[in-house]
């Protein structure tokens, strides 16, 4: 059975004002094309439990992996802009590998708050591997993107990187959140190139934010001792650091109200997600109009 690890495990305290009283809670926007960003949100919420969270999933344009780059940039900027007009946002987390690699410069030019992106956890995986073989499990777009190749060259040059690009796992993760069972035989078939390798990877990077939602199933299918590494806790630590050190917490707007989710189009599938979103701590939902 595989073991799930993350890029670190430290937890920072909630920010306090200089007089020792609790600070106004920051409003944090987490954005993804689908529900994969919930894996990032969950890690951030454990680190900053008192923050006010907004989660947007772009179910109208999901998935982003096969979309043209300029479409994604324009789309992400428009969505963050629409949320900016409705809420007093202190921090934006782009919880999508595809969107992060191409849209962060445009977002940082337009919005005067810290913006965090997600990249595959190749650097920690290269440190953790015992046999020097690291698997990168991601969407085809992430596997093919030059940004990913640069990460491998920079941080894992002495490792053998086995890349596996798949869109099917994204659909499986979405279905799992709807309460559907993940068919393990199908998962084994998708991972067959690694499972049949003479020496499979002993460390696997979950290079899409959807994939930690399937960690239990991946652990059941991959060889005993395989380590799963994702970026969730690293993003959470970065968010906590920014809240503590890069924001004047006394000037936060302190937006009130329940944590809220937004979709871009109301569908039966989006409505069916509400029980799961409630379990994640969201108290209301709405539709975002661009």
Swiss-Prot record:
Active-site residues, as the UniProt record annotates them: 96, 208
Short name of one Pfam family: Asp_Glu_race
Catalytic reaction list: L-glutamate = D-glutamate
Annotated GO MF terms: glutamate racemase activity
Entry annotated with the keyword Transmembrane: no
Keywords: Cell shape, Cell wall biogenesis/degradation, Isomerase, Peptidoglycan synthesis
Any one GO BP annotation for this protein: cell wall organization
EC primary class: isomerase
Keyword Oxidoreductase: no
Domain of life: Bacteria
Gene3D superfamilies found in the cross-reference section: 3.40.50.1860
Annotated EC: 5.1.1.3
Function: Provides the (R)-glutamate required for cell wall biosynthesis.
Protein name: Glutamate racemase
The species this protein was found in: Sodalis glossinidius (strain morsitans)
């Amino acid at each position: 059975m595989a073991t799930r690890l993350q890029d670190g495990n430290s937890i920072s305290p909630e920010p306090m004002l200089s007089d020792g009283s609790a600070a106004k809670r920051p409003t944090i926007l987490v954005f993804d094309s689908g529900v994969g960003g919930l894996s990032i949100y969950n890690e951030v919420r454990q680190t900053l439990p008192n923050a006010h969270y907004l989660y947007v999933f772009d179910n109208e344009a999901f998935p982003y992996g096969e979309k043209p780059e300029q479409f994604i940039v324009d789309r992400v900027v428009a969505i963050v802009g629409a949320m900016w007009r409705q809420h007093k946002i202190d921090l934006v987390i782009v919880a999508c590998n595809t969107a992060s690699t191409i849209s962060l410069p445009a977002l940082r030019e337009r919005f005067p708050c810290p913006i965090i992106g997600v990249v595959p956890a190749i650097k920690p995986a290269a440190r953790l591997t015992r046999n020097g073989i690291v698997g990168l499990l991601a969407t085809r777009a992430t596997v093919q993107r030059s940004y990913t190749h640069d990460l491998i060259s920079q941080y894992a040059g002495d490792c053998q990187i086995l890349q596996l690009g798949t869109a099917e796992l994204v659909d499986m993760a979405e279905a799992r959140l709807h309460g559907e069972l993940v068919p393990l035989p199908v998962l084994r078939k998708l991972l067959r190139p690694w499972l049949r390798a003479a020496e499979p990877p002993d460390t696997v990077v979950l290079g899409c934010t959807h994939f930690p939602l399937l960690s239990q199933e991946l652990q059941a299918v991959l060889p005993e001792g395989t380590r799963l590494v994702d970026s969730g806790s690293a993003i959470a630590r970065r968010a906590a650091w920014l809240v503590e050190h890069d924001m004047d917490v006394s000037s936060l707007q302190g937006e009130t109200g329940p944590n809220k989710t937004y979709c871009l189009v109301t569908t039966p599938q989006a409505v069916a997600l509400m029980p799961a979103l409630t379990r994640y701590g969201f108290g209301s939902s709405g539709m975002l109009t661009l």
